[in-house]
A protein has these predicted regions:
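Glycine-rich nucleotide-phosphate-binding loops and adjacent flexible coil segments
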Residues: 229
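ALDH superfamily catalytic-core signature
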Residues: 36, 71-216, 238-245
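Conserved small/polar residues in nucleotide/adenosyl-binding loops
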Residues: 252-254
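Phosphoinositide-dependent membrane-docking surfaces
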Residues: 233
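Short, solvent-exposed loop/beta-turn-alpha elements that line the ligand-binding surface or hinge
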Residues: 222
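Rossmann-like NAD(P) dinucleotide-binding subdomain of oxidoreductase/dehydrogenase enzymes
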Residues: 1-107, 236
Length: 254
């Protein structure tokens, strides 16, 4: 969605895909090859340290746009500031889904499930914090547990699969480590919290959809982006309290 408005404005674009997942952008470039003039959309695969740094230092760019970690995003922002050009940075999120007791229960369940499990939770705007009003907390969590456990995890091309693999082994280990961190902080695993290895999934980085309960807003699992199929559930009592919890983290603008 960053490409389309740039092209509509008459700009040329250089895209550096993520080092671990370059193929989709390369396939897109193949499709665009027969549609756009040469040089309008350019793909530069490679590591961030080499290809990414070359982009930051090249004088031919009038704007920088980055999606990724805060650490790298800081470098992108500094590079843009040095050259006095604009930069847009998407550096993660901890979006709050607020479930009130007068909600459309089924729609809220669907939204909470899809909000965190879409793309295995590897989305900047994943609904990773689920705030539930106290009067329906137990009922909602019980129903959401069933929803999570009904989700089919597997190879994306297989029928009925909703959740695929995480991007790599390193990311899977990071996400699982957050489950351990949550338990150490006092959270409970309502469902999931483990790697999936059955039915041939041992050859990939698959994880069971995970819900953590008994979470308080000050816990790391409620403060830090996990970037995986893990949602934390936080109980609230009043609208004012829910808004305060949601707004405490600046990464909630989604």
């Amino acid at each position: 969605w960053k490409l389309a408005p740039a092209l509509a404005a008459g700009d040329t674009v250089v895209i550096k895909p993520a080092s671990d997942t370059p193929l989709s952008i390369l396939e897109l470039a193949k499709l665009l090859k027969d549609i756009l003039p040469a040089g309008v959309v350019n793909v530069l695969p490679g590591s961030g340290r080499v290809a990414g740094q070359a982009i930051l230092e090249h004088p031919g760019f009038a704007k920088l746009a980055f999606t990724g970690s805060t650490e790298v995003g800081r470098n992108v922002g500094l590079a843009a500031a040095k050259r006095i050009i604009p930069a847009t940075l998407e550096l993660g999120g901890k979006s709050a889904n607020i479930i009130f007791d007068d909600c459309n229960f089924d729609k809220a369940l669907e939204g909470a499930q899809m909000g965190i499990l879409f793309n295995q939770g590897q989305v900047c705007c994943a609904g990773s914090r689920i705030l539930v009003q106290d009067t329906i907390y137990d009922k909602f969590i019980a129903a959401l547990k069933k929803e999570f456990e009904a989700v089919k995890v597997g190879r994306p091309w297989e029928e009925g699969v909703q959740v695929g693999a995480l991007v790599d082994e390193r990311q899977l280990k990071k996400v699982l480590s957050y489950v351990d961190i949550g338990k150490e902080e006092g959270a409970t695993v309502i469902t999931g919290g483990r790697r999936l290895t059955e039915d041939g999934l041992d050859k990939g980085c698959f994880m069971a959809p995970t819900l953590l309960g008994d979470v308080t807003p000050d816990m790391r699992v409620a403060q830090e982006e996990i970037f995986g199929p893990v949602a934390v559930v936080i109980k609230f009592y009043t609208e004012e309290e829910a808004l305060a919890i949601a707004n405490e983290i600046g990464r909630a603008s989604w």
